Amino acid sequence: MSLNAETKAKIVADFSRGTNDTGSPEVQVALLTAQINHLQGHFSVHSKDHHGRRGLLRMVSQRRKLLDYLKRKDDARYKDLISKLGLRR
């Protein structure tokens, strides 16, 4: 249920702010969004996977916290990120 190394590297390259940036809120939110999207497909097939659903809810909560932090610290970066990821339609 995790992303492969190539997908993670591509996401990090797309959303990083510097060369070795893997911990910025933008990168973390992008990685969580990719994992959440992957798990949504999993739950369409395995609807009774309640343990996996708990992990999904934890990821959604963590993404929400990171987005709140980013919005509080730098609103322009927040708006740019949600437009790139297609969140908040």
Swiss-Prot record:
Disulfide feature: none
GO cellular component assignments: cytosolic small ribosomal subunit
Keywords, sorted A to Z: Ribonucleoprotein, Ribosomal protein, RNA-binding, rRNA-binding
Record SUPFAM superfamilies: S15/NS1 RNA-binding domain
Record-level Gene Ontology MF annotations: rRNA binding; structural constituent of ribosome
Pfam families xrefs: Ribosomal_S15 (PF00312)
Transmembrane segments: none
Biological process per Gene Ontology, one example term: translation
Matches recorded under CDD domains: Ribosomal_S15p_S13e
Claim: RNA-binding is one of the keywords in the record: yes
InterPro entries: Ribosomal_uS15 (IPR000589), Ribosomal_uS15_bac-type (IPR005290), uS15_NS1_RNA-bd_sf (IPR009068)
UniProt family annotation: Belongs to the universal ribosomal protein uS15 family.
Quaternary structure and partners: Part of the 30S ribosomal subunit. Forms a bridge to the 50S subunit in the 70S ribosome, contacting the 23S rRNA.
Record function comment: One of the primary rRNA binding proteins, it binds directly to 16S rRNA where it helps nucleate assembly of the platform of the 30S subunit by binding and bridging several RNA helices of the 16S rRNA. Forms an intersubunit bridge (bridge B4) with the 23S rRNA of the 50S subunit in the ribosome.
Name assigned to this protein: Small ribosomal subunit protein uS15
Native species: Tolumonas auensis (strain DSM 9187 / NBRC 110442 / TA 4)
